[in-house]
């Protein structure tokens, strides 16, 4: 069935799947246009709970030791940043994957490990980490903007080395971010996911090749982006 679909159909199906991966209670009923909302920062903040805002506004150098000490659980941090990332995506189109279920499973494992052993897994214990869509991550597409690479899990023989290193350090992968086609362009746009807007001025481009990461981080949708 997939082989008979056009690349346009495949791309639309991927975008629909991405949209549907965001929990319904995190989806905006209406996304404000750039004409009505140029800068997305305050809008994102206003749609968070006080607890979510407190966690997501912690700088990494404060969040990391808090996670290692159990002052903030990995599950709490993952949920807070995932909600913020979902809002950021709806304003800027910055994501390619939203893998909340896998992220929460990993966060629970890390919280249990810390509770049972009294020590963190590694220096990034429980830290939510976003990945640019060039790093192979098991269970996700890595298209680099090519529709032909959608659903081609067989292409990925092994996860990226940096993914393995970060996971061993305790990272929690929860989203992947948009890039230009082949990353050979200074404009984050491709035929699969489309155009990524600038988070601060939504009339403008997020540039590239890390435009998805740029907009996500500008809206504090991730504490650490690779």
Describe the residue ranges of each PLM region.
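Gly/Ser-rich catalytic/binding loops embedded in alpha/beta enzyme cores
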Residues: 2-226
